[in-house]
C-alpha cells in the first residue's frame, strides 16, 4: 500500500512540477508579448511624432509658397489694371480724334465696354485681323506656353486659384518678342514689375507684349508681322525668360490661344 501511495505522490508531484513549468512558460511568454507590444507602441508613437513633424513642415512650406503665389497674383493684377488704363486712354484718344464723345449711348448701356472709334482704314485692318483668327504667328520664334489664359487651380494647393489675363510663353534667353500681326505701336510703357510693355493696335483689336527690354520700336511706328519689338527679359519671380502676351478687342480681354496658330 505504502509503495502504491508513494507512486501516487510521485505522480502528483511530477504533474505539479509540469503544471508549474507550463505556468512559468506562459508567464514568460505573456511578459514577452507585453514587452513586444510596448516596443511596438513606442515605435508607433515615434512614427506618429515624425509624421506630425513632417506634416507641420509641409504645411509651413505650403503656407510660405501660397503667400508667394498670392503676392505674384497681386502684382499681376496691378499690372493688368495699368494696361487696362492705357487701353481706356487709347480708346478715349480715338474718339477725340474722330470727334465722337466718350459717353455714347452704346457705352452707357448696362454692361457695355468702351470701344474704339474706327476710321475706314482702321475698320479694314480690324476685319483683316479678325479673319486671321487661329492662324496668326507666334510672338516668339521658338517657345512653349508656360501658363495658359484664364482661371486655374494650383495642382498641389487646392485652396489656391490664380488668374492669368494672357498667356505666358517661355523661350530661350536673349530671344526677342515679335509682332503677331501688322499694326501701329499704340503705347510703350515701363510698368513696375512688368518691364516694358508694348501695345500694338490693329483697328479695334490690340496685342500686348509684356516683360521686354532693349526695345526696337517706339510709339506710332508701323510694324509688320513678325517684326522684332524688343528683347524678352528674365522673369523676376522664377528667373525664366517669359513673354506675357495678351489680346484685346476694344477693352475686352480675349484668349490668345484662340488667335495664334497651334498654341
Identify the role of each PLM range.
Residues 1-55, 59-61:
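Amphipathic alpha-helical segments with strong coiled-coil propensity
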Residues 36-149:
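Hydrophobic packing segments in regular secondary structure
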Residues 114-133, 146-179, 202-203, 247:
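Short glycine/threonine/proline-enriched tight-turn/helix- or strand-capping micro-motif at secondary-structure
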Residues 133, 140, 162-166, 180, ...:
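Extracytoplasmic
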Residues 138-147, 175-185, 226:
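Generic structural motif
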Residues 148, 188-189, 232-235:
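Residue-level recognition of beta-strand microenvironments
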Residues 162, 179-214:
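Zn2+-dependent peptidoglycan hydrolase active-site motif and core
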Residues 198-201, 219-263:
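Conserved, short, structured surface segments that act as functional micro-motifs
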Amino acid at each position: 500500500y505504502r509503495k502504491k501511495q508513494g507512486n501516487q505522490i510521485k505522480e502528483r508531484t511530477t504533474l505539479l512540477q509540469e503544471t508549474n513549468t507550463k505556468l512559468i512558460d506562459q508567464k514568460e511568454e505573456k511578459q514577452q508579448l507585453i514587452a513586444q507590444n510596448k516596443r511596438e507602441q513606442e515605435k508607433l508613437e515615434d512614427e506618429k511624432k515624425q509624421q506630425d513633424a513632417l506634416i507641420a513642415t509641409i504645411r509651413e512650406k505650403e503656407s510660405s509658397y501660397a503667400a508667394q503665389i498670392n503676392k505674384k497674383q497681386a502684382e499681376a493684377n496691378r499690372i493688368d489694371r495699368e494696361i487696362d488704363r492705357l487701353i481706356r486712354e487709347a480708346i478715349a484718344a480715338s474718339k477725340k480724334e474722330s470727334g465722337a464723345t466718350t459717353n455714347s449711348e452704346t457705352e452707357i448701356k448696362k454692361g457695355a465696354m468702351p470701344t474704339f472709334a474706327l476710321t475706314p482704314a482702321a475698320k479694314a485692318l480690324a476685319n483683316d485681323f479678325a479673319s486671321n483668327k487661329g492662324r496668326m504667328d507666334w510672338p516668339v520664334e521658338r517657345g512653349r506656353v508656360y501658363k495658359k489664359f484664364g482661371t486655374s487651380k494650383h495642382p498641389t494647393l487646392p485652396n489656391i486659384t490664380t488668374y492669368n489675363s494672357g498667356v505666358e510663353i517661355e523661350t530661350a534667353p536673349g530671344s526677342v518678342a515679335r509682332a503677331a500681326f501688322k499694326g501701329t505701336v499704340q503705347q510703350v510703357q515701363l510698368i513696375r514689375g512688368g518691364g516694358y510693355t508694348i501695345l500694338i493696335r490693329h483697328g479695334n483689336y490690340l496685342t500686348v507684349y509684356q516683360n521686354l527690354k532693349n526695345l526696337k520700336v517706339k510709339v506710332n511706328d508701323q510694324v509688320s508681322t513678325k517684326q522684332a519689338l524688343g528683347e524678352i527679359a528674365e522673369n523676376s519671380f522664377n528667373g525664366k525668360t517669359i513673354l506675357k502676351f495678351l489680346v484685346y478687342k476694344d477693352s475686352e480681354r480675349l484668349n490668345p490661344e484662340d488667335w495664334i496658330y497651334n498654341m
